[in-house]
Amino acid sequence: MMANGVEKSRTLYVSDLDGTLLGDDSRLSAETVSTLNRIIGELGGLFTVATARTPATVVPLMQQVHARLPYIVIGGSAMWNPMLGAYEHTHGIDEATVDAVADVFDRHGAYPFIYRRHGNSMLHTHHYGPMSAQEQRFVAERQHLSLKRFFLNDRDYRHSDDEALLIFSMNKYATLSTIADDLRATVPTCSVMVYHDIFEESEGFLEIFTAGTSKAAAILCLAREVGAARVVVFGDNLNDIAMLQAADYSVAVENAFPEVKAIASEVIGPNTAHSVAHWIEADLIQS
């Protein structure tokens, strides 16, 4: 059976993690894990994830999945090869842009994290200035991770010989939107993404990459590499819209933001019902 005239075995399936593939406990359910392993193993499906997360948390989350394709991580600024345990296809922010972005944060009295690739597998995260309770929890939950190391109270946090992949901040969504508008107006050498926290809409996240970086661009790059003739993408949040629009077929979970469901080809069940894995399995079986 063919879908849109394309053999489904050459379909690349790409899912966001938080709010989409993960449950509300921010983990993969046992049902999703077993279904994904059947998709990859028995059915020969081409599956991966595209996420704002770093390998430091993606690798533990995906450890039971028999992944064969690179993960698209850090909002598309890198891929992670789970077979080799190493970064691939990194897109660094030049140091002049890092300085320009940090200047904008200074004007707004905000203090970002700068994520830098250290070697082929480590991520060094630099920060200077006070941290909110939310940021303190964020750091505490990640201090033990084997693929990430924090450098806090780093007076020279802007500068390093390591490649900068991401400048990141968490704050009230309205505050971050103002900073994002300033960045778009004054720093043309960066890409800016601001979106809501799925657990509290008044809170948000701001991500800055080198210009042209996105999950959408990384997905299209991976599709070319694996020879996929059809791309299906799953998402829930505003930062998923571009990759959904770049897909041949886009799928929103029921719990997605209204703006996401409005542009999707199809809306399926919620993230709490293993909906993404079940949809992919059914799509492959029908072929």
At which residue positions do the language-model features occur?
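Anion (oxyanion) recognition and catalysis
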Residues: 37-41, 106, 184, 245, ...
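Asp-based phosphoryl-transfer active-site loop
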Residues: 9-26, 101, 244
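Active-site phosphate-binding/coordination module
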Residues: 30-138
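Short, structured coil segments at secondary-structure junctions
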Residues: 65-67, 75, 186-188, 246-247, ...
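Mg2+-dependent phosphoryl-transfer enzymes with acidic/Ser/Thr/Gly-rich catalytic loops
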Residues: 3-12, 29, 205-287
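Short, acidic loop-to-helix structural element flanking the phosphoryl-transfer center
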Residues: 26-43, 90-97, 150-152, 210-224, ...
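Conserved acidic, metal-coordinating active-site core of Asp-based
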Residues: 118-232, 238
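Short active-site oxyanion
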Residues: 43-48, 67-69, 166, 229-230, ...
